[in-house]
Amino acid sequence: MKNYWNCSVSDSEMNLKKKQMQKNFKNTCDSVSETFVGSGIPSSTFGKNGDIYLDRTTQYYYKKNNCIWIKYFCNGYCCFKGCKGGFFCQKGDKGNNGNNGNNGEKGQKGLKGIKGDIGDKGSKGDIGEKGDIGDKGDFGDKGIDGNKGSKGDIGDTGSKGDKGDKGDKGSKGDIGDKGSKGDIGVKGSKGDNGDKGSKGDIGVKGSKGDKGNKGDKGDNGLSILSGLDIPSPDLGMDGDLYLDTITDELYKKINGEWIEITNLKGEKGEIGSKGTKGDDGNKGNKGIKGDKGTTGDKGDKGDVGNKGDAGDKGDAGKKGEKGEMGNKGDIGDKGNDGIKGDFGSKGYKGDKGSKGTKGNNGFKGDRGDKGDKGSKGDKGDNGIKGNKGSKGDKGDNGIKGEKGESGSSILFGMGLPDQNQGEDGDIYIDTLTGELYRKVNGLWVPEIDIKGDKGEKGDRGNVGDKGEKGDIGLKGDKGEKGEKGNVGDKGDIGTKGDKGNVGDKGDIGIKGEKGDIGTKGDIGNKGDKGDKGDIGNKGNIGNKGEKGDKGVKGDIGEKGEKGDKGVKGDKGEKGEKGEKGEKGEKGDKGNKGDKGNKGDKGDKSDKGDKGNKGDKGNKGDKGNKGDKGDNGDKGDKGDNGDKGNKGDKGDNGDKGDKGDNGDKGNKGDKGDNGDKGDNGDKGNKGDNGDKGNKGDKGDNGDKGNKGDKGDNGDKGNKGDKGDKGDNGDKGDNGDKGDNGDKGDKGESGSSCQIENNDGVTIMSVCTPGIASIQAYQYEITDISGLENPYDPSNISGLNFKLFDTVKGAFRTGNFTADNMTNVGINSTAMGYHTQATGSGSFSFGNNTNGIISSNGIGSFVMGITTSSGVIISEGDGSIASGYSTNSSTIEIQNNSLSSIIHGYSISGSSMRLMEGNIGSMIIGSSETGSIVQSGSGSIASLINVRATSGTISIGSMSYGSKIFGYSNNGTITISDNVHGSQISGIVTNNGQMTIGTLSHGSYLHGYADTSSTISIGTNSFGSECIGLAQNNGTINNGDLSFGCRISGWTLSGLLSTGSGSCGTILYGVAVNSGIINTSGRNFGCFVGGYCAYYGKITIGANSFGTICHGTADASGTILVGTNSTGNLVVGSSQGTISLGSTNFGSVILGYTENSGSIISDGNNRGIFMHGYSSSASLYTASGSCGTVLMGYGTSGSAINVSGLGSFTFGYCPSSGEITQVLANGSFAFGRNNTTVSENSFSLGYGARSYMPGSMAFSSFATSGNPLRAGSAQTIKVLTRNLNTEFVLADGNFPTLPYTGYGNIKAKIIGSSGTMSVLYFQVFFDGSTHTVTIPTTPAGGQIVYSNPVAVSPAPTFTPVATVPGFSVTIANPGTQTFVASFGIVNIS
């Protein structure tokens, strides 16, 4: 349902500035209405009669009549009209149509009154403070302690104290005090007075609104609409405003569309902090407490407790006969302290606890009627007059008021308004700042920032909400009914309280309780006699024994000497637990009971000294734990164990308990665990038979008969063994209760036991040193450290607080036996030995030599364990955290979902999340051979750890897992089949960082130092390995790993992809003999990088279609291995770029310098080499076929072809060689070529041919002799004439280097066309060349042509020179000549 306001002005607030503006308009008539928008109730200090105020936080609107703001709630279309004249007035007229807002009367229902009511109610809450006196009634609970005093005959009155127990119920009444606040809530009922708002009928005056009919004309002006959520497009007219009351977003309709203008919320709220003024409403919150006052009615139940006179039910106290054991309870004289319970008489005040009825005082909340002042809300009734405003419907005729549209408009914009914009009376809102302007006399005058101030009022509105809670306080009225005691009927249920009725008598008896204590003294006197009769030595000594506890320690000290034997005592740390054994010394108090001497026999239990190993074992079972200390033969714990020796006496004393069967032994027993000695007290029950003589109590003497049973109590000495059965004996006492009401007095004997009428809830102190609570749901046990839980024989535990009641389980500190053996369900364990095996368990810490364990679903474990300690959490969602040393283990075992380990484990320790730990995490440090492990199947697990000489690993099938860590001489491993996993870290000193086989898409990033390894296993597709490997470190991708990538830096290390890897990328830096390598049998892989100082970048053997790209510097090597096909090597080298042997169809491209080389090894087929060599070599090795070599060589470079059918071309300077033709059938083309293979050809400048069947065609050889010894060779040497002789390019003469003959054909051509052929022979004897000219043709010369113009014709004569040979020219004329010497050398 959307709410509509049709007003002349919107979204404007009034503050002091508005007051100033009102001064500017003070001459306007009251008929001029204005509309304001704000947060909270409008202040009466602004506005004029007829003005409209919209509270945007509540959707209420107010109209000012008679200088009072009247509240309305608009559920429909509300129109308010003002006079046509003035500013904003016409649109206000539409507001008159708001008379439909009569529905707003709902709002009138005391909303305002609620606020006032709340304040009044708060005053009532003050009365509730008196209820605090009812707390004194809690002292009445102390009166219950007085019941123990009932052991005195006077204790009968103590039963009245039971009524005091009902007073406890009265404590519930204390809660009722809060109910008194509820009384204030009653004022909220005055909010009902808000209903009086119906008086708004008086609002008939709204007929004035009829004038508003004229305002109907204003309808064409603007409408302010509101609703929940974004406005509907079909809602409203252009120029209308819409307020989203959920978001406080303000919209304006422009051209049929709703446009967001600004948000009225936000910053205003900050100012709203001022709203703290609404604190008065907070008192109304106290009224909320008044609801609790209803519970105070239960306090009335305490009244029913008066009925509790039937408290005769105290018969259940017959169990109190067990209280006869309470005679031993003479110790119960301490109950004399209960005398203080006399103060408990104040517990009568506890009756005041029924002051829950004081919630009745909440009736004072009637003062809340002052909230009737809220009836001012009745003025809101005037708003009802708006109902008459419905007559405004007639105003519909006033549509003519549309002319009034010229009245005022609400404009919006970003920034200051344009002075040419709008008309006088219009409103402009700057949507950037929330500042609102009004146009006056042609000027835009700033009025207020819409944001902010409203927020202040909004705070007040919040307080009003609290007042609504005060309405809840009405329930406090029900508390008044509680006075009627109707609620008290519920108290009837408190029949248990009937005993409490008796307690009423006890109220008087409370004072008597002091007497009761005295009576206890009387009984105590008798008891003294009885004690003596009983072998009171036990009792008397036992008392002294308490003092003797210290002395007992001295005795134990002697045994401590034996502890000296416990040199193993170094384990003495455990011995500290032995100090707890000193608590056993308290047992020694019993030792003062001469029986303690028997405890000395306990000393004979030097075998217990063996317990010294378990020094705690000396303490008796604790020493056994000491045996665990044997595990700590580190013996330090044993030292403490010496103290345990003292405890051993105590332990033997426990055995002494069994000795209780020997009455004397009873003395010793009591001395040891004197508490068990209390069981000996059962023997005292036999004594109680004597007391049966005392049977004055035996007035219930029937009980004395039971005393006969006490005779059996002697047998009961045997019963000492049945100490555990002692509780059962109490059951026997219950039988005594059957004997009669006198048993009620036995209830006073409850000095050792108090039982609730429900027969389920029992409080017992019958066992010395133990307070035992038995409850249907909740049990809290506080153990001094002298007894059970859960015996055999606890072995150095105790010291705890236990809550179980069918394994809701709770315990706090120390424990064992073995730490209470598998407690389980909903468990909590804290401090020292802890353990909580079970679902929902919680375990805390410090288990120095044992296990800290929370074995269960949702478990939590923390702690510190040393000396082979273990921290374990087995279960889903478990957390194990701690510090575990000396071969310790921190472990969350199988199938623990979302588990976490956080710990520090050293000395061979292990931290591991076992198999199936999905989403698990290990954070910590595992040192010295330790193992950190997340088991297999651990999906998305995380390990962040440091391991020294240890192992960090995630098991197989653990997808998406991560390891971040450091391993020194250890291993960081993600096992096989771990897809999408990641390792980041450092391994050093032979450490390993590995991802196992079949781990697809995995990522390894790290640093491997000192022979360490970073590797991804075989068959790991799409994985990546990045890192630094130095000092023989290795970064490696396993065999058959497709599409993987390795990148890194290696110093004397190795970066490599395994063999059989396809499409893998390997790039990096290898120095100091480092290697970047694809291991072989790689397909389509890429290797790139930089290698220096004997580093290598290599493609392994049997690789296909692989690319090797890099720089080999300072003796580095770039190499493609043997038997590879279709590979590409591209690089730069001051070392070697090499294509291994038996490569097919591969390509080498590169640059080599400084004695470097680019090489294609032998037996390669169809190889292409292309390079640049500076003082280096480019060559193909022998045995290669069909190789092509192209290159350029400088500074002594050599470009050589040694393969069959190869082709080489290039350039070398004079100091170098290009392409020595080293293989048969090869061809070299270039400069400074040499053919040294048969049937090959060398062509170029300075070409040479050395082998048979080969040929060199040389142009102007520059140095050396183009001929070489051997079989016949064909060489062409080009020469030119220098003056009259033919010389080589360097001016020297051709020579024959070896002895032998050279048959020469010289073909000479002149520049003018002369051509001649000469034949001659040269012989070289090793020092001198000799030329022989044949006779045919004459002179060996044939002249083919000599142009007529050349005359005389030149002639040519072969001659010998020094050294070598030449041809001289006669009549050269002006021609220049070249000569080609074709030489067949026969050597």
UniProtKB/Swiss-Prot annotation:
Keyword Glycoprotein present in the record's keywords: the answer is: yes
**Posttranslational mods:** May be hydroxylated on lysine by the viral-encoded procollagen-lysine,2-oxoglutarate 5-dioxygenase.
Enumerate the transmembrane spans: none
User: Which residue ranges have biased composition labelled Basic and acidic residues?
Assistant: 114-181, 189-199, 207-219, 268-340, 364-382, 390-405, 454-535, 544-747
Compartments it resides in: Virion
Give the start-end ranges of region Disordered.
98-219, 268-422, 454-753
**Ranges for domain Collagen-like:** 95-154, 161-220, 266-325, 344-403, 450-508, 512-751
UniProt keywords, alphabetically: Collagen, Glycoprotein, Hydroxylation, Repeat, Virion
Give glycosylation sites per the record: 6, 794, 814, 819, 826, 846, 886, 894, 969, 1032, 1077, 1123, 1200, 1224, 1232-1233
Which terms in the GO cellular component ontology are assigned?
virion component
Which superkingdom, per the lineage?
Viruses
Where does this chain mainly localize?
virion
The record's function comment reads: May participate in the formation of a layer of cross-linked glycosylated fibrils at the viral surface thus giving it a hairy-like appearance.
PANTHER family, sorted: COLLAGEN ALPHA-1(XXV) CHAIN, SI:CH211-266K2.1
Listed name of the protein? Collagen-like protein 6
In its UniProt entry, the species of origin is given as Acanthamoeba polyphaga mimivirus
